[in-house]
Amino acid sequence: FFKVLRSGTASIVTDKIDRITDHGLLLESGDELSADLIVTATGFNLQLFGEIDLCIDGRPLDMSRTFIYKNLCFSDVPNLFCVLPYDKTSYTLKIDLVSKYLCRLFNHMSKTATRQCMPCLRESDYEMESIPYFKGIFGGSDPKPGYIDRAGDNIPLRCGDRHPWRFTMNYDEDKRILAGPIEDEVMRFTT
């Protein structure tokens, strides 16, 4: 595969298929790809937390009403963390940053005898723009993989237009944010 790609006789195209033609595929961009053989694939569908029904105190949790905090947890949801990957950078870089932050957070909770941490919107945050998670990642113009297009309603996460609710895809920015103080005006600790 890579030998053929380097030779210049093959290329990679990101587009959507408009229809199958006598000679191959007509793409929505208007380009036609010649093909002797077309292999179809169903792809996969993203699921948030494996479609687990999350509850807080017996009440169902509507994740579409939460905002992502520092790219790792959610507003008004206690003690729930996840690693949201970068789109163009190694997942392990993000895992390393989040792991270090969580170790600091758990050590802080142990030292302060707190059992729960939960980011809460500040009064000024209620006026911020609510940006769907995948729009926050890809913006409006980048071509997206099909599984991202299909994920819209399955991944109801939102980010905001300001720190710490703004979603980043930048390792250096995440490193700076996650190296900051554990206690801030957003994270609430309770016993």
Ranges and model annotations:
Residues K3-V4, G8-E28:
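A conserved short coil-to-beta-strand element within the FAD-binding core of flavoproteins
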Residues I12, I20, L33, L37, ...:
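Generic recognition of stable, solvent-exposed alpha-helical segments in well-folded globular domains
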Residues F67-I68, N79-T191:
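C-terminal, flexible cofactor-proximal segment of oxidoreductases
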